[in-house]
Amino acid sequence: MSSSKDSFGARATIEVGGESIDIFRLEALAKAGLGDVRRLPYSIRVLLENLVRFEDGETVTKADIEAVAKWDPKATPSDEIAFRPSRVLLQDFTGVPAVVDLAAMREQFQKMGGDPSRINPLQPADLVIDHSVQVDSYGLLRSFEQNVELEFERNRERYQFLKWGQKAFQNMQVVPPGTGIVHQVNLEYLARVVFARGADGKTVAYPDSLVGTDSHTTMINGLGVLGWGVGGIEAEAAMLGQPIAMLLPQVVGFRLTGKLPEGATATDAVLTITQMLRERGVVGKFVEFYGAGMESLSLPDRATIANMAPEYGATMGFFPVDAETLAYLRFSGREEKQVARVERVLKEMGLFHTAEAPDPEFTDTLHLDLGDVVPSIAGPKRPQDRIALSESKRAWGRTLEGIKANLKDTAKTSAEVTLDREGEEPVTFELENGAVVIAAITSCTNTSNPAVMISAGLLARNALAKGLEVAPWVKTSLAPGSQVVTEYLEKAGLMDDLEKLRFHLVGYGCTTCIGNSGPLDGPIRDAIVQNDLVVTSALSGNRNFEGRVSPHTRANYLASPPLVVAYALAGTMDIDFAADPIGKDSSGADVYLKDIWPSSKDVTEALREAVTTEQFEKRYAEVFEGPEQWQKVSVPGGDTYAWEDDSTYIRLPPFFDDVQPGEPPAAQDISGARVLALLGDSVTTDHISPAGSIASDSPAARYLKENGVSPRDFNSYGSRRGNHEVMMRGTFANIRLRNLLAPGTEGGVTRHLPDGEQMSIYDASMKYQEEGTPLVVIAGKEYGTGSSRDWAAKGTYLLGVKAVITESYERIHRSNLIGMGVLPLEFTGGQNRESLELTGEEIFSIGGIAEGLEPGKLLTVTTDSGKEFQAKVRLDTPQEVQYYLHGGILQYVLRQMAAS
C-alpha cells in the first residue's frame, strides 16, 4: 500500500473520530480526465480502488487503472488485472490441504537451501473448522455432545495439525470446531467492511475484500464486501502475496422492486433469482443488485441471495454498502468506532450507496418484482431447477416416473419397516416411494437468517398445538451456522418446540448441506437398498447434486427452514400442500399447511423480542477458545511439520518433489494419450472428488483397510484431504458418476485400453502410468460446476491426466486445473464429443504446446482414427500461462522465492 505510485493523486487524509486516516479517493480519477466513476458498478469501483492502492508500475500499472476506470460494460473481457484481496478465508476440508501444501513447500524450500520460516501467509488468513461434524446422533437432547465427541475422535490428528499450523505460520488464526459455519461466522464477526492498517507511520483505510476456499464465500457480498471462492491452490498463492490474476469482468445488474409477499421467504427469493440467472447465463460475470426493492430486504435476506452466487453461476452476487449494512454491523455487535469508520471512509471513496444515487451502467440487466415471488423448492438434483410449491406434487410425479424407468424390474414401490429407536416405542410403518427420509435445517444460506429460523420454530409450535407429529421414518436435524441461532431460539421458547418434533441440535457446522448427513437408521436403509425404493430429502441448504446429501436419497430438494419442518410432518414429497392435509389434529380433523404457517406479523414480533445485539457479543467474545476437547488437543512445535509415515490423515504430498530453482522444464506436446473418462454435461466437482462417505468396496477403502483402518473409522473423503493416497483413489469415485467409456455402469469405473478390461478409474490410471501413457478426460458443458474443490484438480493431476477437453468450464475448477499444471481445453465452433463422434477409444495427440502457448491459442488435436479438430487453450491470462508452464501456481511461487 505505502508503495503506491499514486499516478492520479488519489491519496488523501481525512479525520474520523479524531484520528487521521489516509484513503484513496476515486473522484481523483475523474479530475484526471478518466470519466465519472459514479457510472461504474460498485463492485468495479472496489476493484478500481484496489488497483489505485497497489499501483507499483509492474503488477499494477497506470494503464491498468485507466482500463478499469474506463470499463466498457458491453466489451468482451480482455483486460487482465492483478487483484490483491485484504484477507483469505478457509474452511477445514479445504484448509487442511492448504496448510499441508504450505508445510510441504517449507519442506522443499529447506531442501533447496532456504529458511522454511520464510514460507508464511503475508495476508491475514482465517480458518473456520465447520466441515467435519457429521449427523451420527439425532433426535436426542444429547445428540450435539455425541456428535462432537465422535468428531474429535475421528479428527484428532487433523485438528492437531491445524493447531500446529496456527502456531507455526504467522497471520493465521483458527476458529475451533463447534463454533459455527465459516460464512456465517464471517458475516456475523470476521468481516470488517473497512480495514485500517499502519503503513509508513500512517493509518491507511481501505475496503475489506477476500478470496475463500469455499465457493459460498460470496455470502459476504451481502454485507458489501468484495469476495468470491477460489481453489485452495489459488488461495494459498494469495496468502503468499501473489495477486489474483483475473480478466476485468462484465457486470450484470439485477434490479429488484417491490417486497416479498405474505408467505414468501428469502429462500423462495433466492431460488427464483437462481433460476432466472442460470437461464440468462452469468458464468464468469459479477452480478450486482440494485433498485428500490433492495430497501425491503434485510441484510440477512441479502446474504441468503449472495450466498447462492455459485448456484446461479456468477463470480459474485454483490450488494453495495448502504444504511442497512451499517444497521446490521451495529446490531451484530461491531464497535461503534468501526461502524463510523465504515460509513465515513466509504462515503469519501464513493463506495457508499444511497437511494438517490444514479443507477450504474451494466453489461446486461434483469428485473424481479419481489412481490411475484411464491413459495418454492428446488430439485431433484440442481439448485436452479425451481418448482413452485403449488406444482411440487405434479413435479414429483414426473421425477418419480423418470427415475423408475432406470430401476431394476425387481424394484418395489413400498416396504414394511419396523423401527426400534432409543427412548421410543417400536413402530411399524410402510416406507413408500417419495418418502422424505432426511429433513435437515442446515447451512449458512438460511440459518444466518433469523426470520426463516424463527418461522421454522413458530411452524413447529403451531403444528404441536394441532397435535401433529413428524413421520417416524424422517431423520431430523438442526445444525445452525452460529451459536447465536440457538441463543435466540431458546429466548423465544422455540427450541423446545423444535425438539418436540425431533429437530434437536446436532452440531454447529455444515452437516447435511455438504453430505455429512450421517447414516440412516439401519432398518430404513436396508428397506431402501433391498427394495430399490426412491426416497427423498428436504434441506435448507444450497446444493442438492446427485449423491451429495446421502447415497440413499435419489431426489433431494432445497427448501426454506419452515418448509423443511412441513415436509418432515408430511413425510413425503407426494403432497400438494394447498389441497392435501399435512396431518390430522387430535380430534381427527384434517390440518393443512396454511393452518400452521406463521404470519409475517408473528415472525416480526418474535424477532423483535428474541434476537438481540448482546447475543452476538456474548457468543463471539470467546470465538477462538473452542470446546474443552479442542483445548486439550496437544500441539507439536517446529518450523517444519513432523510427518508420520503411518498417518492416514496427513501425508507429505509429492507436488513439489521435482521443483528445483531456476526455469521450469520446457513444455511438451501431448502424444499417444488415452481417455480415462468420457463424461456428459454438468459434471460437478462432487462427481470428480466426492466429499462424503467412502464406499466399502472402493480403492480408497482398500488402501485404508491395508493401513489398519476399520470401516467404522473411514470417516469421509473431505476429512482425508490431507492424505493424497486416499484422495487420488477417491478421484472420479462418486457413486453417481456415469463414465460413457464403461456403459451400463455407475461410479468410478472405466475400461483400460486397448485390452478393454473394466476396472476402477484409479486402477486404470496406475496401469496407464506404468505403461507411460498420458491421459485425457473428455466432457460436455459446465464441467467442474459446484464446490471450489481443489482436490478435483489435484486428484486429476495425480491420476496422470495431462489435459481436459470440454465444451465449457465452471470458473473455479478451470483455475484449479491450471494451478495443478493440467491443461484446460475447449471444443470450438460448436463442436463436441458427439458431433465429432468421439468414442473415447481413440489415441489422442495434442500439438502446438511445445512451440509456445498464449491465452486463447488454438491447438490441433488428432486421433489415430483420423479425426482432427481444434481446441482452444483456456489459459485466459499471461499469468495463467506462466503458472501452467511451471507445472502449477505453487511451483511458480516456490521458484520465485528460491530466486529471491
PLM features: what roles do these ranges have?
Residues 1-900:
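Fe-S-dependent hydro-lyases/dehydratases of central metabolism
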